[in-house]
């Protein structure tokens, strides 16, 4: 059995397959996901697993260069945004590099999410609880 944080075989494989600048979307239960896009659907029921708990585990195994958020999270879900930014700042310290943070309107976020290598769907049911993590390199 694996000793690292990600036990889900499909999610572990997706993370391992990411190359430099590849995108990985972690999203709430409502974000549209194209049928042809690779999706790791972790959603069990409303709120399980949560967006933040899923993000926390993924960040233990992924070197992140930049992230993308929907601008609307600032007004519609400031608590999630604040906790997410705290996690990203902590990760930047651990990685020894700044992580670029970009905001776009939600319609553009959805278009960019469609270009991500994969999407991880959570059971989160709060507005705009979505992020695209762009893979970096640790060297």
From Swiss-Prot:
It is found in: Cytoplasm. One of its GO terms (molecular function) is intramolecular lyase activity. Its EC number is 5.4.99.62. Pfam families: RbsD_FucU (PF05025). It catalyses: beta-D-ribopyranose = beta-D-ribofuranose. It comes from the Bacteria. GO terms for cellular component: cytosol. Pathway: Carbohydrate metabolism; D-ribose degradation; D-ribose 5-phosphate from beta-D-ribopyranose: step 1/2. Substrate binds at residues 28, 106, 128-130. One of its GO terms (biological process) is D-ribose catabolic process. Keywords: Carbohydrate metabolism, Cytoplasm, Isomerase. SUPFAM superfamilies: RbsD-like. Its main location: cytoplasm. The active site is at 20 (proton donor). InterPro entries: D-ribose_pyranase, RbsD-like_sf, RbsD_FucU. Belongs to the RbsD / FucU family. RbsD subfamily. NCBIfam families: PRK11797.1 (NF008761). Homodecamer. Catalyzes the interconversion of beta-pyran and beta-furan forms of D-ribose. This is D-ribose pyranase.
């Amino acid at each position: 059995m694996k000793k690292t944080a990600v036990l889900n075989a499909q999610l572990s494989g997706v993370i391992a397959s990411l190359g430099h600048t590849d995108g990985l979307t972690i999203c709430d239960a409502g974000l549209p996901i194209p049928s042809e896009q690779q999706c790791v659907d972790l959603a069990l029921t409303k709120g399980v697993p949560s967006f933040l708990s899923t993000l926390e585990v993924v960040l233990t195994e992924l070197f992140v260069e930049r992230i993308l958020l929907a601008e609307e999270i600032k007004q519609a879900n400031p608590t999630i945004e604040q906790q997410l930014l705290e996690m990203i700042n902590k990760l930047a310290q651990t990685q020894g590099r700044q992580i670029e943070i970009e905001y776009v309107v939600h319609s553009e976020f959805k278009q960019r999410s469609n270009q991500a290598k994969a999407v991880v769907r959570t059971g989160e049911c709060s507005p705009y609880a979505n992020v695209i993590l762009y893979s970096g390199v640790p060297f």
